[in-house]
Swiss-Prot record:
The lineage of its organism: Bacteria, Bacillati, Bacillota, Bacilli, Lactobacillales. This is Acetate kinase. The record marks H179, R240 as: Transition state stabilizer. Homodimer. One of its GO terms (biological process) is acetate metabolic process. It catalyses: acetate + ATP = acetyl phosphate + ADP.
Length: 399
């Protein structure tokens, strides 16, 4: 038996989950928020209990020490030595990492930092988490698991952009995708639920949270995905634009005071757009739906645009694969919002997909929510990226 921690490090946060492996039992999970502040918050959930404290945490290294000390204080572990492995979620692996990798050299961490060009909001923070654990637990197995790795099976026709070739060969501008660990997990879980080999299935996986992406999974491999060069591409999201005409950028630079620097573009497109930008209210779908029900026109438009973009991608991916066996919803909105699922799927009667209202509205919902007669099954599967990360730590530990 071993104890493995799955880590998702943000710029000011550290989300974690501790597993007993290979049993895959969750011993504890938690979140450290406001790293770098005097009023940071560390929360630990274990055995149906929750412990929280507010304290100063100056950086990620201090956060890791607090995390481990909390585990000892709460009698979840006896000493640091019980932790045998750590797996880190990393958003961008580029073409350099096509699978999870051991952090067995400084070069691996430096490469993760270099790839921040592809995920400026994520990779530097991911690397900070890796360095923090290396400093405090230098001898345990350390693994990096990439959001982009699952999508490295996309054919060139799907991942290339129609730009001059030199921008691909010299600057590596292409589609990389994201949320790959989530898409991988729910695709494989769907195959188990449907009791069919994943090699025989054509699936469309729909990851709907604050970030949203869809993937066409043919025979267990990603053949197309909605997010692009960065997680900004694809469908409309909580605060991100998704795809739009590139000519919008120079137009706004010429005609407004808001778009003067690349940082302005990144900030507005990543943090001020999407549901938030259209509704002028919130990036939270629950608030958007409540406002829509109350007759708020901006919220209604945001809601309908969100659904519209997802419908179009599902239809496109069914065509890309020349058919589809199942559509799988996951992540915060995908798992919890029955109305959104219903609104999306009512556009696919022609495909042979349906939703049984009683199954769809059951809470919690898990598994098939379509009728037995449906040609295309519809499923809801809670994602578990942390478990995939823990499994990869165990797999690479034994290599």
């Amino acid at each position: 038996m071993s104890k493995t921690i799955s880590i998702n490090a943000g710029s000011s946060s550290l989300k974690w989950q501790l597993y007993l492996m290979p049993e895959e039992k969750v011993l504890a999970k938690g979140l450290i928020e406001r790293i770098g502040k005097d009023d940071a918050i560390s929360t630990v959930k274990f055995n149906g209990q929750e412990a929280s404290e507010t304290l100063a945490i100056k950086d990620h290294t201090a956060a890791v020490k607090i995390l481990l000390d909390d585990l000892i204080h709460l009698d979840i572990i006896k000493s640091y030595d019980e932790i045998t492995g750590v797996g880190h979620r990393v958003v961008a692996g580029g073409t350099y990492f096509n699978e999870s990798a051991l952090v067995d050299s400084e070069e691996v961490i430096k490469k993760v930092e270099e790839l921040a060009l592809l995920a400026p909001l994520h990779n530097k923070a991911n690397a900070a988490g890796i360095r923090a654990f290396k400093k405090i637990l230098p001898d345990i197995t350390s693994v990096v698991v990439f959001d982009t790795a699952f999508h490295t099976t996309m054919p060139e026709v799907a991942y290339r952009y129609p730009l001059p070739n030199k921008y691909f060969t010299e600057n590596q501008v292409r589609k990389y995708g994201a949320h790959g660990t989530s898409h991988y997990y729910v695709a494989h879980e769907a195959a188990k639920i449907l009791e069919k080999p994943i090699e025989k299935l054509k699936l469309i996986t729909v990851h709907m949270g604050n970030g949203v992406s869809l993937t066409a999974v043919d025979g267990g491999k990603s053949v197309d995905t909605s997010m692009g060069f960065t997680p900004l591409g694809g469908v409309m999201m909580g605060t991100r634009t998704g795809d739009l005409d590139p000519a919008v950028i120079p137009y706004l630079m010429d005609n407004t005071e808001d778009f003067k620097t690349p940082e302005d573009i990144r900030r507005i497109f990543n943090n001020e757009s999407g549901l938030l930008g259209i509704s002028e209210l919130s990036n939270d779908m629950r608030e958007i739906e409540a406002a829509t029900a109350a007759g708020n026109k901006n919220a209604t438009l945001a809601y309908n645009m969100f659904i519209d973009r997802i419908i179009k991608h599902i239809g496109a991916y069914a065509a890309v694969m020349n058919g589809v066996d199942a559509i799988v919803f996951t992540a915060g909105i995908g798992e919890n919002d029955a109305h959104i699922r219903s609104e999306i799927m009512k556009h696919f009667d022609w495909l042979g997909a349906d939703i049984v209202t009683e199954k769809n509205e059951k809470r919690p919902v898990y598994g098939v929510i379509s009728s037995n007669a449906a040609k295309v099954k519809v499923l809801v599967i809670p994602t578990d990226e942390e478990l995939v990360i823990a499994r990869d730590v165990e797999r690479l530990k034994t290599k």
